[in-house]
Amino acid sequence: MQPALLDTSVYITALRAGSDALGTLRRLAPQAPLWLSAVVLEELYAGISRRDRRVVERLERDFERAQRILVPNLNDWSQAGQVLARLAAEYDYEEIGRGRLTNDARIAMSAGRQGIVVITANQRDFAKIARFRNFRFELTAV
């Protein structure tokens, strides 16, 4: 079974749904080894409420113990920049448009390198990135 990671959009939806929602996320990839992107972790910490902080801390601890935290390497950063430049040219993005896609590009580059499928609710951005970098993503409505 191909490994998977959940995008920030999936975790945020689950956190908003309530305390038990994170436990049900496993059903999105029941047989797949799950990974946590360091980029997703950063986004979660940056945007969570005090109430949800312990949930995210537990996620970090559990994935770190399992040695399944995916950290972008130098090549991922370089490829993300190249993809963002191509997206800017293709879609006439200004700096804000590119900035919005930066984290998603790093997630896509690192997941693609490791053969990990990204499970997301954000079709718009990941579909654009996929035009310029081969990686797998699947949509979910959570």
PLM features per residue range, with description:
Residues 14, 43, 79, 128:
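Phosphate- and divalent-cation-binding pockets in alpha/beta enzyme and binding domains
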Residues 35, 70, 138-140:
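General small-molecule cofactor/ligand-binding pocket signal
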